[in-house]
Design a protein with these regions (language model features):
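DNA-contacting interfaces and partner/effector-binding or oligomerization modules
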Residues: 109-165
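N-terminal low-complexity or simple alpha-helical regulatory segments
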Residues: 1-121, 136, 157-160
Length: 165
């Protein structure tokens, strides 16, 4: 059973707390017992955490879950996925996806560079103070590693993620 530590569960609800919205309904909708949150060492099943992330996004109507100055309407990632669905290479997919997000949002500027057969995908939170526990930065990295890997049906080995924190 794949699990995720409570830190990520608590961190993802930052936007709910900032907007003074109740967290318990989101936990319950995701199938997470709110009592579990009292124990920092407790782990939560990945399916429940995925439901919680989606619930937070839907509650806030913000795919960036309140970690950026401007919201990112729910459905934008799906629109990007549709846009890149006809790409024939990983490079083309990443290029179109980066251009798309840079066009629609200034909150997480992205850059794709290539050198000697390697690609470097970089991004920086425009207002890192809105992501105090670096949840969104880490979540964004996971998304941009897993989505292309799923799309091409092959593993993509990270050579070395680098963080500014």
């Amino acid at each position: 059973m794949a699990t995720i530590c409570n830190h990520h569960v608590l961190s993802c609800m930052h936007g709910l707390r900032e907007n003074r919205l109740a967290q318990q309904p989101a936990l319950e909708r995701a199938g997470i017992n709110p009592a579990v949150m009292e124990n920092r060492s407790q782990r939560v099943h990945t399916d429940q955490v995925a439901r919680l992330f989606k619930t937070v996004q839907e509650t806030l109507n913000d795919e960036f879950m309140g970690f950026t100055q401007n919201s990112c309407k729910v459905g934008l990632f799906a629109t990007m996925a549709e846009l890149v669905s006809h790409c024939s290479t990983l490079g083309e997919l990443l290029e179109k996806a980066v251009n798309f997000y840079n066009l629609v949002s200034d909150d997480i500027p992205m850059r794709l560079s290539r050198s000697r057969g390697n690609a470097v995908l970089s991004f920086k939170m425009a207002k890192p103070e809105l992501d105090p526990e670096h949840f969104m930065a880490e979540f964004w990295l996971v998304i941009w590693h897993r989505f292309p890997r799923w799309y091409i049906g092959k593993p993509i080995r990270l050579r070395g993620p680098h963080f500014t924190f």
